[in-house]
């Protein structure tokens, strides 16, 4: 019998996410219908300060944590007759250890790579905004840190449940990374992670 660890079969996750776009709101998964039209004309992506990025990510992302950032960008939304407001954050961070970048990008030094530590968009943005936002964040990253030639991003197909066994996070299979021409490099080491 498994206690608070319940693993979803990757195909179950893929079937679910084929019809929905996963987002986070107050650390809980929510979903936008896949295929809804995204209007980029009312959005912009800009570099943002650490404090603003951290406050957004910690309040929205399921983990409630913030990585060691090297670069941060925000997605801003502007409604008619309203002030522009933050609706998403991408955090490009220091990888967990010095071996990550050379492992996935042979020939690069650790400083020539970066990890996409967090990408969190609020449910205010229509589905499919992720790939649009990520492309613009990557352009800004290239200007801010021209030495960076590789980005590592992880997807996590395993569900997370709280101490009561309630679903906190469905897994995801990296659809936005595929849409951004990322190359799948396989699984990282298996581990057990208990969330309090």
Task: Label every model-predicted segment.
Residues 62-63, 80, 121:
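Short beta-turn/strand-loop junction motif enriched in small, turn-promoting residues
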Residues 26-68:
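Short amphipathic alpha-helix that is part of the acyltransferase structural core
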Residues 40-43, 70, 87, 111:
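Sequence-level motif detector for i,i+2 pairs with an aromatic at +2
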Residues 44-47, 93-196:
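Acyl-donor binding region in acyl/amide transferases
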Residues 2-34, 38:
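Charged, low-complexity intrinsically disordered segments and flexible loops
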Residues 68-70, 189:
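A short, compositionally biased
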Residues 57, 70-94:
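Conserved beta-hairpin
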Residues 1-7, 114, 130:
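Eukaryotic non-globular interaction segments with acidic/serine-rich, low-complexity composition
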């Amino acid at each position: 019998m498994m206690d608070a660890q319940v693993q979803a079969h990757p195909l179950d996750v893929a079937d679910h996410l084929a019809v929905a776009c996963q987002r986070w709101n107050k650390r809980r998964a929510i979903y936008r219908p896949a295929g809804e039209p995204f209007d980029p004309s009312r959005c912009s992506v800009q570099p943002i300060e650490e404090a603003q990025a951290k406050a957004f990510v910690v309040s929205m992302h399921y983990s409630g944590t913030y990585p060691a950032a090297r670069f941060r960008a925000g997605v801003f939304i502007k409604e008619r007759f309203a002030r522009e407001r933050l609706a998403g954050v991408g955090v490009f961070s220091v990888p967990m250890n010095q071996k990550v970048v050379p492992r996935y990008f042979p020939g690069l030094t650790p400083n020539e790579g970066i990890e996409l530590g967090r990408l969190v968009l609020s449910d205010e943005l229509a589905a499919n905004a992720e790939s649009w936002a990520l492309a613009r964040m990557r352009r800004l990253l290239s200007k801010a840190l021209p030495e960076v030639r590789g980005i590592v991003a992880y997807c996590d197909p395993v569900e997370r449940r709280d101490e009561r066994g309630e679903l906190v996070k469905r897994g995801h299979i990296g659809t936005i990374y595929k849409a951004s021409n990322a190359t799948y490099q396989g699984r990282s080491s298996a581990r057990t992670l208990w969330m309090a």
